[in-house]
Amino acid sequence: MKRIFVPLLLLLSLACKEKQKAPLTAQEIVDKSIEDSGGKLYEDHKTFFEFRDRKYVSENNNGKKVLKRIFKVDSVTITDVKTGNDFQRFMNDSLVAVSDSIATKYANSVNSVHYFARLPYGLNDPAVKKELLGKETIEGKRYHKIKVTFDQNGGGEDYDDVYVYWFDVENFKPMYLAYSFHVDGGGQRFRKAYNERYVNGIRFVDYDNYKPKDKDSDILQIGQLFNKEELELLSKIELTDIKVEQD
C-alpha cells in the first residue's frame, strides 16, 4: 500500500508544479503591470503634470475620463478638454467654436500625452487587442514582449498603429515601448523608461525617445536594433510638477 501511495503523492506534487508554471497570458501580464503601477487609483484620483511648458490634468467625472491641456498664448489661457469622443476649447473660460478637423487634431494631441503618462493603464481599454510574442532580452535583461493593436471601432483616428511593450519578467513594469505610426509621413519610435517615481501610489516615468536609422525597419525587431545601437536619440520625454489627488 505504501509503495502505491508514495508514487501517487509524487505525481500529484509534479502536477501541482506544472500548474504553477503555466505560462502567463498577455492579459495577465498587463493586469499585473497595472496593479503594480497604481491599479484602481487611476479610477478615482486626479493627476496633474507639466510637459513642455503645458499643464495636463486627468480626472474622472461621473464615470467619464476627462483629459485637459492648459497653456497660455500671450495673455490668453487656452484650455483643451477631451471627454470621451467630445472635444472643447476654452479661451479665458469662454467656449470657442473649432472645426471638426481641427478638433480631431487637438483631441488626438491631448490624448497622446495623457496616454503615455498613464501607461500601462490604457492597455485594458475595450479597443485594445493584445498578443504575447514571447520573451526578449534588452540590455541584458529578460522581458515579456507584447504586441498591441486596436479595433477600428473605438480605436481612434490612429487605430491602425502598432505598439510593442516590454514588461520586466520579475516585477511586470513596462520598461520599453515602441510604436509605428502613419500620420505626417509615418515612422517608428522606441522609448526607454527612466526616472521612475511613485506619486501617491501612481507610477510615472520619463523616456528617452529614439527612432531607427533605417526608416524601413520592422517594428517587431526594433528591440534588437536598440541592442545593436542602430537607433538614434531624438528627444527626452520628461514630466514635471506631478501631483496626484483623490477625486
PLM ranges: what are they?
Residues 143-242:
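Gly/Pro-enriched, hydrophobic low-complexity segments
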Residues 51-79:
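N-terminal, post-signal-peptide region of Sec/Tat-exported proteins
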Residues 42-48, 62-69, 140-147, 174-176, ...:
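Short, hydrophobic/aromatic-rich segments at coil-to-beta transitions
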Residues 33, 58-60, 194-196:
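Extended lipid/amphipathic-ligand handling interfaces
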Residues 4-13:
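Sec-dependent N-terminal signal peptides
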Residues 16-54:
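N-terminal leader/targeting segments and the immediate start of mature chains
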Residues 69-101:
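Mid-chain, structured segments of secreted extracytoplasmic proteins
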Residues 21-25, 89-157, 181-184, 238, ...:
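Flexible, processing/modification-adjacent segments and terminal tails
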